[in-house]
Amino acid sequence: MSVYDKLSSLGITLPPVAAPAAAYVPFVQTGNLVFLSGHIAKKDGKVWAGQLGAGISTEEGKQAARAIAIDLLGTLHAAVGDLNKVKRIVKVMSLVNSVGTFTEQHLVTNGASEFFAEVFGPEKGAHARSAFGVAQVPMGACVEIELIAEVG
């Protein structure tokens, strides 16, 4: 099954690339690696704001991470023209806007990791990962994620 067939079976339509909010580009490709800039959580077209542990639950954070993963695939599609060219997701880095006592950043980030495995399969979707708790994310978003993918 192609990546697009899988997305369609999940009822997912890839979004267009969002305009950068500052002085950066959405992606850079060097050789067979594509580096995607951080994408923030959005809900109903607006920034999904808040802090984990202070009004945003772990489950909501996980949903936000999944939403970001969908946005990341929209950008990756724009970068390479065909998601079936993805050989693997290499690395995911997640910044979780959280209070100092919140310790479930890894569970929040599973929202993206599990989505990539679902779409690309257990081998291509498996990746190295970091999940950080931070005091703030741009525009007050609850989660920001960046991605590195290998294409061929």
Locations of regions flagged by a protein language model:
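Short, polar/acidic, helix-capping and beta-turn segments at strand->helix junctions
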Residues: 1-152
